[in-house]
């Protein structure tokens, strides 16, 4: 039996308690939630979580993510599929960018008012993840890069780290609610992370993240910032805000109950 824990780096009890902590699997005692506070970066927070927990499967989730009823059983089903496809898999995610640059999902995003991502028929190998939710197999022995700044692009970095070690990362049909706030434009902390990734993975560029293409020239950074400015009003109108209960969002997406009953459930969700 593989054991499961969910790790979250949170700086807001209000956001946490309105979203991730509302996920039924915690209230039902079917999974544990490990919290990290006051870390200077996502990498440091998540490495601390790895050191503080022992579960075979660690789910790194944002505090504004909601996991609908039965989500843990769907996770078990997806991991059984990827295990059958690649017994040495390292990472799995709810949303990622395929090797062909296709967006693999689906997830709900409140900031743009859409379900995003193509639903694949089987686990699909990816080059990057959206950081809203990343699943790691502890036996992969992966660690996050504590030299990486801030809170952006670590989903791309951990995938590239895995690939550099001969391991693979996948995304598949693992719905989640991302009750995220609208962001008007890329800020300086995002630019810092972009430059770091340019330097670190310069021999592997270009790389496509869910937000931007990382290229040697960096022209896509300037292009995206220009597009952000010119599309700000349109994108703001797409946002539904963050005041809707995540349970209601899950219901509207058709995800109120994701319970599935795999024949061989090897994931112990009681730990």
Question: Where on the chain are the PLM-derived regions?
Answer:
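Glycine-rich, basic loop-to-helix element that forms the pyrophosphate-binding segment
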Residues: 39-53
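Conserved donor NDP-sugar-binding/catalytic core segment of glycosyltransferases
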Residues: 70-107
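Short, flexible, basic/aromatic active-site loop/helix in glycosyltransferases
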Residues: 106-131, 141
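Short, well-formed alpha-helical segments that are part of the catalytic scaffolds
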Residues: 12-27
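A short, conserved alpha-helix in the catalytic core of glycosyltransferases
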Residues: 127-141, 148-175
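Active-site donor/metal-binding and catalytic loop motifs
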Residues: 170-192, 196-200, 211-217
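Short aromatic/hydrophobic "clamp" motif used to bind/position activated sugar donors
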Residues: 58
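The conserved acidic donor/metal-binding loop of glycosyltransferases
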Residues: 62-66
């Amino acid at each position: 039996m593989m054991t499961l824990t969910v790790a979250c780096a949170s700086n807001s009890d209000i956001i946490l308690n309105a979203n991730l902590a509302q996920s039924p699997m915690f209230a039902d005692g079917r999974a544990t939630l490990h919290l990290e506070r006051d870390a200077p970066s996502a990498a440091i927070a998540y490495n601390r979580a790895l050191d503080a927990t022992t579960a075979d499967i660690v789910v790194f989730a944002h505090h504004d993510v909601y996991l609908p009823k039965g989500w843990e059983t769907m996770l078990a089903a997806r991991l059984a599929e990827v295990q059958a496809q690649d017994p040495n898999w390292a990472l799995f995610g709810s949303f990622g960018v395929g090797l062909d640059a296709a967006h693999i999902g689906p997830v709900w995003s409140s900031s743009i008012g859409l379900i995003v991502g193509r639903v694949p028929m089987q686990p699909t190998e990816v080059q990057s993840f959206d950081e809203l939710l990343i699943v790691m197999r502890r036996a992969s022995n992966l660690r996050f890069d504590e030299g990486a700044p801030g809170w952006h692009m670590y989903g791309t970095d951990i995938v590239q780290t895995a690939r550099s070690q001969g391991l693979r990362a996948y995304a598949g049909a693992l719905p989640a609610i991302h009750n995220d706030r609208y962001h008007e434009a890329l800020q300086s902390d995002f630019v810092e992370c972009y430059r770091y990734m340019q330097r670190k993975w310069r021999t592997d560029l270009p790389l496509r993240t869910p937000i931007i293409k990382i290229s040697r020239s960096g022209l896509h950074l300037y292009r995206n910032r220009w597009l952000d400015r010119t599309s700000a009003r349109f994108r703001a109108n797409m946002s539904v805000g963050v005041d809707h209960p995540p349970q209601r969002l899950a219901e509207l997406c058709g995800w109120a109950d994701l319970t599935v009953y795999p024949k061989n459930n090897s994931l112990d969700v009681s730990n």
